[in-house]
């Protein structure tokens, strides 16, 4: 979709994605190797009583779920900004996540381009919000 096809206040819901313990440990091993993500024994004695997903992974999953819906298609040029990211609740192995996306703003620019800002709100299978953040992209008008 082009910038002008989006409406402020428009809401989309993505499909869901189940996050396995192996997914969590593989991602964290490469990108966020803190004990609560990679060390089951130590994590079991910690605040969350077990392995949890990295917030960076939760952000990446949220973005993936939105992008896979295909609304940007070939009209997206580039991401421009991420703001107000909040990791609200932990994501545990076997949680199933989905994202609600709300169009917050659209700013036409020159050269047939514009900036689209959306709010990504990600929930688990119990409909508990685990992540929220704003994403802005440069997109064709």
Swiss-Prot record:
Gene3D superfamilies: Hotdog Thioesterase (3.10.129.10). Residues 8-112 form the MaoC-like domain. It holds the Pfam family MaoC_dehydratas. This is Uncharacterized protein YdeM. The gene is ydeM.
